[in-house]
């Protein structure tokens, strides 16, 4: 009697071969006889026109305007001149008293009001209103404050932070500078996991370029307002994506979450008010 084999048994017999030689011979013979005499035929894969699957997606995405990923695939990541030609650092100038498309943001409150009107929320999962976090950090008393960019994404198959950091380093730096000016911070920190060497290299290179061009340093674009940035590589611990664990890691301690309150916006890095935003 021929032992019936199906697709799953074929896979098992190829990967989990019997230990005894005679059983191997018998299994192989059964497999060959099954293929020779079986009447079963494999079902061909079903094919659909592309518009059946892609049309609804295209209808949803086509009407959207890209913001964070604007000029995707068009702009060279490390080309500062191209970034400026496409409007880069214009909003930063507007926050320093300049004008962009007839608009200016002369005060920190006007920046926060604009963010509140936009409805911008955090992308870390909780969806906390960004304007509220900025407002709390700005109102927190203290001689020194920090801005931290959380680039430590640990979700399997998630590369949002990686894509943004690798593709738009100047855009992320500009956003950090604006955040620092708004909340009153003088130092920014990029916390990027070491598994993203290209992201680390591009952000580090972009920081050096911005320092040379006057966008970072003791006087941002000659405004007299200082802002310095450094890059820290994370060791890859999933828990360090949580903001209090991230701060503990920055302080050289074990990356473990702590109870809140106080929140980092009130008492964060080195006991100072700290704004932690996702990339």
Residue ranges and their predicted role:
Residues 1-6:
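Short, exposed "boundary/linker" segments that immediately precede the start
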Residues 8-279:
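Feature of Fe-S/electron-transfer and energy-metabolism proteins
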């Amino acid at each position: 009697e021929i032992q019936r084999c199906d697709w799953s048994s074929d896979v098992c017999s190829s990967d989990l071969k019997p230990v005894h030689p005679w059983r191997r011979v018998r299994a192989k013979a059964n497999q060959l006889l099954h293929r020779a005499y079986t009447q079963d035929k494999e079902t061909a894969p079903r094919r659909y026109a592309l518009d059946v699957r892609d049309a609804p997606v295209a209808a949803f995405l086509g009407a959207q305007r890209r913001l964070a990923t604007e000029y995707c695939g068009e702009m060279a990541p490390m080309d500062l001149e191209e970034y400026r030609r496409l409007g880069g650092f214009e909003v930063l100038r507007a926050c320093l008293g300049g004008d962009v498309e007839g608009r200016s943001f002369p005060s920190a409150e006007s920046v926060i009001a604009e963010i509140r009107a936009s409805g911008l929320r955090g992308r870390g999962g909780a969806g906390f209103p960004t304007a509220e976090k900025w407002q709390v950090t700005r109102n927190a008393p203290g001689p020194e404050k920090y801005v931290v960019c959380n680039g430590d994404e640990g979700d399997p198959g998630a590369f949002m932070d990686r894509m943004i950091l690798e593709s738009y380093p100047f855009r992320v730096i500009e956003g950090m500078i604006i955040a620092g000016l708004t909340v009153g911070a003088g130092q920014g920190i990029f916390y990027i996991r070491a598994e993203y060497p290209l992201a680390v290299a591009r952000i580090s290179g972009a920081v050096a370029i911005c320092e040379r061009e006057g966008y970072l340093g003791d006087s941002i674009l000659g405004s007299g307002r200082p802002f310095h940035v450094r890059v820290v590589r994370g060791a890859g611990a999933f828990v360090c994506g949580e903001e209090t664990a991230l701060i503990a890691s920055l302080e050289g301690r074990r990356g473990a979450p702590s109870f809140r309150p106080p929140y980092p916006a009130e008492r964060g890095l080195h006991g100072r008010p700290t704004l932690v935003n996702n990339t």
